[in-house]
Amino acid sequence: MYDWLNALPKAELHLHLEGSLEPELLFALAERNKIALPWNDVETLRKAYAFNNLQEFLDLYYRGADALRTEQDFYDLTWAYLLRCKEQNVIHTEPFFDPQTHTDRGIPFEVVLAGITGALKDGKSKLGVDSGLILSFLRHLSQEEAEKTLDQALPFRDAFVAVGLDSSEMGHPPSKFQRVFDRARSEGFLTVAHAGEEGPPEYIWEALDLLKIQRIDHGVRAIEDERLMQRIIDEQIPLTVCPLSNTKLCVFDDMAQHNILDMLERGVKVTVNSDDPAYFGGYVTENFHALYTHLGMTEDQAKRLAQNSLDARLVKP
């Protein structure tokens, strides 16, 4: 079944480039940039990839991202991910990147962007993988800081298809960022946002009504609010769900409890994605395979999930 799932044409709509930084590449970048890491070797680092919640993961995620310093580093990171896309028949990807993670460390915005977009262009020409880049604001920082990031992005607006919102969800509702999302939309950007992962269904309502998003990233807690579920079904608002991430971060205790197939059968436009695959133990095919192994996903369900991902693209073919 793995090979069949791997061959299925699909899109990935919820992937953080910084979260695809595999330990081997992290160590190579640290050596290249003469950065001391708190882990002795790749295996020690892999053992550190045990999280009880989103914040524990984010602490490690930001520590790893510190090894990314140069345009070549960002190119290598993005290219390594695109090679995985090619291996797994991901024909289209819409990855996130977090400029604030890097500009706050003194890395110029244009250095980060040049490395990523250079790889995405090569991914199209050399691998046949289409893409659309999403600039994501960090919600644990202020709206004013997000606005500064938007200002930095405007000279390069053609490089992006949308702006998004990620990082620590609890205590940072979408309403905190209404003004910057209004500005982004007025500048022609589409909008997406993480909501309803650890946060309550109210955060999803806010993302829809205040940020006016085209797509909900995660959204698994929508099932707790029947009125919200009906709206998502009626309006066919896509959810970019990340099963392995949800179990690694204890949103669900184990994969057998995941609600993605329940939502699919109710008519929700759910999609399968890997989120931060280097940290969560698998890319898109591994996420599909986990649904087959633990939830008994059928071939028909897999085809519908894959088609949903292609239908939910912001960048239309």
UniProtKB/Swiss-Prot annotation:
Positions contributing to substrate binding: D276
GO cellular component: cytosol
Keywords: Hydrolase, Metal-binding, Nucleotide metabolism, Zinc
Keyword Hydrolase: yes
Name of a matching Pfam family: A_deaminase
Single GO term (MF): adenine deaminase activity
Alphabetical list of InterPro entries matching this protein: A_deaminase_dom (IPR001365), ADE (IPR028892), Ado/ade_deaminase (IPR006330), Metal_Hydrolase (IPR032466)
Origin superkingdom: Bacteria
Keyword Hydrolase in annotation: yes
EC number: 3.5.4.2
Binding site for Zn(2+): H14, H16, H194, D275
Cofactor, how bound (note): Binds 1 zinc ion per subunit.
GO biological process, one term: adenine catabolic process
Listed cofactors: Zn(2+)
Catalytic activity, reaction form: adenine + H2O + H(+) = hypoxanthine + NH4(+)
Class in the EC hierarchy, top level: hydrolase
Role according to the record: Catalyzes the hydrolytic deamination of adenine to hypoxanthine. Plays an important role in the purine salvage pathway and in nitrogen catabolism.
Site label Important for catalytic activity, positions: H218
Active site: E197
Source organism of the structure: Pseudomonas savastanoi pv. phaseolicola (strain 1448A / Race 6) (Pseudomonas syringae pv. phaseolicola (strain 1448A / Race 6))
Protein name (record): Adenine deaminase
Protein family: Belongs to the metallo-dependent hydrolases superfamily. Adenosine and AMP deaminases family. Adenine deaminase type 2 subfamily.
